[in-house]
């Protein structure tokens, strides 16, 4: 393989989706688990490895699958359990970005690694509320550390807060005096008027599909020059939920620029 490293993760136990997809490729692989923040996490780690001179090319990739996630985190589909209004629909999708050391094209120019944030949300069917404070904390840290503002970006993308989580994030930003037009992959990926997905999409493959599909295509066409991609992850497990534990969350932010 021509790849020096692959950074990959997914939602299945022990990240078997990623390891199975790479097991016959001969690629040096680092497995990740950041839940729905995995695409952003893999991007920033791949960029760091190249920037530090440890790799010439690196792959950032992730995936998710609706039925397997339902079975693992909630109920098997055959059970017929009723979904709550705050729940989100795990996207069956995947995304992969190949990074190199070139000077032209779309580049990763900065990143903010998020801290774990836990505001006491215990409902596994309300991940947007658990993740929104983490998104706020990372955005606040990003603007503060890099001395930048929301208007410095053509678009700010989160993934995947869903409708409720997005409303909470906008409220937190407004309360802090930050005016930002933040769009969410979980809201963008489905047509909620025609598809009953409750609060929208979720899963590693949700933000990965939106980023690697329409967003990077818009950057390549010159419609977007500077994009802030904020991957949010609810770091729960089935066991922690069953034991009544609250849901820790994290958000990593990556700046993509078209030269």
Indicate where each model-derived feature is located.
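Short, well-ordered amphipathic alpha-helical segments that serve as non-catalytic structural scaffolds
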Residues: 1, 43-45, 130-145, 210-215
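Short beta-strand segments
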Residues: 8-9, 58-64, 99, 227-232
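Short acidic, glycine/serine/threonine-rich loops at helix termini
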Residues: 17-19, 44, 69-74, 121, ...
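Active-site-proximal alpha-helical scaffold in enzymes
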Residues: 33-60, 99, 202-223
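Long, repeat-rich segments with strong aromatic
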Residues: 134, 140-172
């Amino acid at each position: 393989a021509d790849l020096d490293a692959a950074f990959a993760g997914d939602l299945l136990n022990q990240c078997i989706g990623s390891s199975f997809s790479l097991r016959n490729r001969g690629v040096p692989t680092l497995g990740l688990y950041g839940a729905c923040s995995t695409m952003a996490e893999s991007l920033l780690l791949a960029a760091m490895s190249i920037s530090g001179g440890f790799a010439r090319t690196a792959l950032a990739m992730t995936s998710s699958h609706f039925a397997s996630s339902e079975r693992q985190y909630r109920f098997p589909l055959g059970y017929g359990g009723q979904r709550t209004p705050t729940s989100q629909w795990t996207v069956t999708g995947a995304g992969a970005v190949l990074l190199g050391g070139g000077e032209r094209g779309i580049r990763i120019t900065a990143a903010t690694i998020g801290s774990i944030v836990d505001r006491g949300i215990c409902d596994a069917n309300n991940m947007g509320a658990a993740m929104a404070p983490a998104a706020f904390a990372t955005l606040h840290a990003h603007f503060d550390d890099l001395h930048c503002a929301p208007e410095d970006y053509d678009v700010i993308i989160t993934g995947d807060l869903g409708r409720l989580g997005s409303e909470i994030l906008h409220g937190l930003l407004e309360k802090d005096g930050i005016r930002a037009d933040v769009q969410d992959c979980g809201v963008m990926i489905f047509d909620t008027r025609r598809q009953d997905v409750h609060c929208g999409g979720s899963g590693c493959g949700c933000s990965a599909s939106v980023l690697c599909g329409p967003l990077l295509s818009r950057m390549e066409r010159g419609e977007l020059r500077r994009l802030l991609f904020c991957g949010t992850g609810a770091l729960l497990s089935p066991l922690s939920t069953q034991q009544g534990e609250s849901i820790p969350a994290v958000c990593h932010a990556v700046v993509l620029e078209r030269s």
